């Protein structure tokens, strides 16, 4: 029996009344753009797209050539279809409405065009993360303020990981599903329906080099993980860290674990490292739809009301019981501080 294609999956979701035709079209076009990005990534040095672009983004980060190329591919692909009202990207200062010469649709698309791009020159898996919101009714030209919706308002979220195989992981609010790109026919085929994150885990993903900058609750939590079976947790934990959020979260969706990027004192003015709208919200939705959890260490990520397009937050996501345990350390520390 042949595997269903992404196209068939989306049509069946539409026929079941779970999505409308415009959302189906949007996801289809995003998936096509991801195929183009996959081709560019896979060429590596042969494509002349490695290295720095010589520019910086709104975050103050140096852009890679592939950051810029991936951003342009997504903007171009989504400009003319009539399903989109505006786009916002981690690589752009402000949101961008569809050009005047094209029809405007009902949806807002946010994306990190190439997450983990700092690793691209060393051939580590990278990916594209995206989130879809509805444009507020009556909005003719959406601006940044119209994107400031909590993650609970997302109608779809996903990522495409460019690794040994190219995979699209998608949620439309009814489970999380994985599609693998069959390169010969150029189609994404369903390879894992209803992904489930195990509730318990013995793996954690964190950048330990920042340990000296963590707050006490974080120090205590990770200290107990490292103490293993001789400590308060009573079991050994393994650490995994790829430094590419897409790759780390994909592993957690596949076999469980907890991904942590906490607030730290190294840059105390920033509330976190990862972006709420482009990374935390879509990844949080994907993980929750797979039975996991996503918090800031103190509150559910999807409940946060954004105040800025490029807002940052701490991120704890993955296996439900372990995320709850990490959150407990922070809540109890706050109570003890009065």
UniProtKB/Swiss-Prot annotation:
CDD domains according to UniProt: FBPase
Residues annotated as binding substrate: 115-118, 207, 273
Chain residues that bind Mg(2+) 2 = 112, 115, 279
What Enzyme Commission number does this protein have?
3.1.3.11
CC terms in the record's Gene Ontology section: cytoplasm; cytosol
- GO molecular function terms noted in the UniProt entry: fructose 1,6-bisphosphate 1-phosphatase activity; magnesium ion binding
Which Pfam families does the entry mention? FBPase, FBPase_C
Q: In which pathway does it act?
A: Carbohydrate biosynthesis; gluconeogenesis
> What catalytic activity does the UniProt entry give for this protein?
beta-D-fructose 1,6-bisphosphate + H2O = beta-D-fructose 6-phosphate + phosphate
Indicate the quaternary assembly.
Homotetramer.
Name the family.
Belongs to the FBPase class 1 family.
Task: Indicate what this protein is called per its UniProt record.
Answer: Fructose-1,6-bisphosphatase class 1
Instruction: Give the species.
Output: Xanthomonas campestris pv. campestris (strain ATCC 33913 / DSM 3586 / NCPPB 528 / LMG 568 / P 25)
Question: Gene for this protein?
Answer: fbp
């Amino acid at each position: 029996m042949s595997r269903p294609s992404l196209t068939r999956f989306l049509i069946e979701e539409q026929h079941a009344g779970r999505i409308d035709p415009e959302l189906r079209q949007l996801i289809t076009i995003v998936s096509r753009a991801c195929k183009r990005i996959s081709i560019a990534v896979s060429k590596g040095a042969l494509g002349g797209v490695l290295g720095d672009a010589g520019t910086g983004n709104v975050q103050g980060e140096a852009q890679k050539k592939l950051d810029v190329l991936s951003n342009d591919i997504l903007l171009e692909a989504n400009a003319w279809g009539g399903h989109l009202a505006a786009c916002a990207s981690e690589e752009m200062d402000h949101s961008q409405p569809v050009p005047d010469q094209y029809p405007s649709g009902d949806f807002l698309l946010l994306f990190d065009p190439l997450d983990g791009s700092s690793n691209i020159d060393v051939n580590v898996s990278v990916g594209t993360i995206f989130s879809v919101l509805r444009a507020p009714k009556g909005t003719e030209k959406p601006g940044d303020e119209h994107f400031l919706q909590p993650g609970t308002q997302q109608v779809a979220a996903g990522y495409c990981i460019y690794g040994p195989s190219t995979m699209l992981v998608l949620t439309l609010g009814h489970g999380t599903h994985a599609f693998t790109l069959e390169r010969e026919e150029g189609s994404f085929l369903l390879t894992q329906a209803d992904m489930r994150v195990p509730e318990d885990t013995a793996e954690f993903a964190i950048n330990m080099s920042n340990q000296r900058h963590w707050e006490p609750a974080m120090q205590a939590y990770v200290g107990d993980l490292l103490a293993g079976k001789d400590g308060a947790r009573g079991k050994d934990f393994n650490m995994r860290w790829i430094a590419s959020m897409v790759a780390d979260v994909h592993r957690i969706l596949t076999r469980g674990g907890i991904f942590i990027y906490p607030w730290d004192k190294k840059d105390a003015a920033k509330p976190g490292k990862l972006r709420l709208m482009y990374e935390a919200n879509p990844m949080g939705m994907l993980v929750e739809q797979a039975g996991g959890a996503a918090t800031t260490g103190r509150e559910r990520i999807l409940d946060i009301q954004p105040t800025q397009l490029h807002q940052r937050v701490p991120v704890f996501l993955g296996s439900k019981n372990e995320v709850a345990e990490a959150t407990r350390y922070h809540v109890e520390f706050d109570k003890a501080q009065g």
